[in-house]
């Protein structure tokens, strides 16, 4: 089996990992670097039950369990730990001090943390970039090969894939897996695939200089100008705190390296953080960043065979749950490619055939 994976984010790395566990030595083609986009700039929260009642329930539950198994089996440290998660509210326009004791000690008295959303039984976290890199490194140790280059086409012969064009050269393949996050939309010019969109989000990483308890916080926060944001705060075991908020629908640039924060978005997020926590108001900021999360038209991932082209597969569109669902996606894709069926997760809800293929003439990108 000659397999080529297009994309070295968390989904591509996870597919490579599980393929190598079955004896396949895939080639992973990446034009920028491992975890260069959302896989390296997301929060890394894991929740076992938060997709319950949706078509992603089985995928999320199994993937949560796989995360624990992978962390237990590996000698590498990618920041996996169980966390307690809370929900609350706050406003930049009020100085009201809540008389009840907040369960989180590092937030301002003006923040009302009134709900526990998850416990160490069902919520956890990883450092996304470290996890993705570790999965890729494990795959490489079993024979996978990472090549830096730009995929420019998928070659076909007699209704099946025959290879991938990379910077003008052909890599022969029996299986081609598109796992390029929101840039998977580029593959609609080569294969009959539905559209994948990018939802932009902004984030900060603070260096607090002290260990913060494993407590994740989800807020509804009213800015001084009246806008309502939903910032998320994830302390990490390395002494940093990751915070994200402020989404936008700005167009996806054609190259991942061209992604940059929207004007004013980082400053707004810094003001929110200063209002929420004195620890953040005085902490150094070690990363100011933005990324695009991949989303399909109906909000569900695209995982499965590309219709009408034998040997072509896609795995993308996981939205905010890409880190959570990567292990189960990687395992299921390896089963689908090698066994033609999956054992633990039913991929029917994510079949690309449920959505109409995109007309390549409609492809549009932002600057870069």
Regions found by a protein language model. Give the residues of each.
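Short loop/edge segments at beta-strand edges and connector loops
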Residues: 30, 148-150, 287
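Predominantly flavin-linked oxidoreductase catalytic cores and closely associated redox partners
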Residues: 127-213
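C-terminal catalytic lobe of FAD-dependent flavoproteins
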Residues: 277-368
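N-terminal Rossmann-like FAD-binding beta1-loop-alpha1 element of flavoenzymes
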Residues: 2-27
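Active-site substrate-recognition segment that forms the wall
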Residues: 17-18, 44-46, 78-82, 180-308
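Conserved FAD-binding subdomain of flavin-dependent enzymes
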Residues: 18-21, 31-85, 93-101, 224
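Conserved Rossmann-like nucleotide-cofactor binding loop
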Residues: 11, 34, 183
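Flavin (FAD/FMN) cofactor-binding and adjacent substrate-gating region
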Residues: 69-149, 153-160, 295
């Amino acid at each position: 089996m000659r397999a080529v994976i297009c994309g070295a984010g968390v989904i591509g790395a996870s597919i490579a990992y599980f393929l190598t566990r079955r004896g396949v030595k895939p080639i992973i083609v990446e034009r920028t670097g491992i975890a260069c986009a959302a896989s390296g700039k997301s929060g890394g929260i894991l929740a076992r039950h938060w997709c319950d009642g949706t078509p992603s329930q089985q995928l999320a539950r199994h993937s949560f369990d796989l995360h624990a198994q992978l962390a237990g089996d590996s000698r590498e440290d990618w920041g996996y730990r169980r966390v307690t998660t809370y929900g609350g509210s706050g406003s930049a326009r009020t100085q009201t001090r809540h008389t009840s004791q907040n369960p989180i000690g590092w937030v301002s008295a003006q923040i009302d943390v009134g709900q526990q959303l998850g416990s160490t039984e069902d919520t956890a976290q990883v450092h996304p970039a470290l996890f993705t890199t570790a999965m890729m490194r494990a795959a490489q140790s079993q024979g996978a090969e990472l090549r830096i280059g730009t995929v420019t086409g998928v070659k076909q012969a007699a209704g099946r894939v025959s290879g991938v064009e990379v910077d003008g050269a052909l890599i022969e393949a029996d299986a081609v897996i598109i796992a390029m996050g929101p840039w998977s939309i580029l593959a609609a010019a080569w294969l009959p695939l539905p559209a994948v969109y990018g939802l932009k989000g902004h984030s900060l990483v603070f260096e607090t200089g002290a260990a913060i308890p494993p407590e994740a916080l989800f807020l509804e926060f009213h800015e001084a100008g009246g806008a309502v944001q939903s910032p998320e705060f994830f302390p990490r075991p390395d002494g940093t705190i990751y915070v994200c908020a402020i989404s936008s629908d700005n167009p996806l640039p054609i190259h991942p390296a061209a992604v940059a924060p929207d004007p004013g978005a980082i400053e707004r997020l810094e003001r929110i953080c200063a209002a929420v926590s004195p620890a953040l108001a005085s902490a150094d900021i070690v990363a100011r960043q933005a990324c695009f999360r991949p989303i399909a038209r109906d909000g569900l991932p695209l995982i499965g065979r590309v219709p009408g082209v034998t040997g072509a597969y896609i795995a993308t569109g996981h939205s905010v749950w890409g880190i959570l669902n990567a292990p189960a996606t990687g395992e299921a894709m390896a089963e689908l490619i090698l066994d033609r069926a999956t054992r633990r997760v039913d991929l029917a809800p994510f079949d690309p055939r449920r959505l109409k293929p995109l007309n390549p003439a409609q492809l549009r990108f932002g600057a870069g």
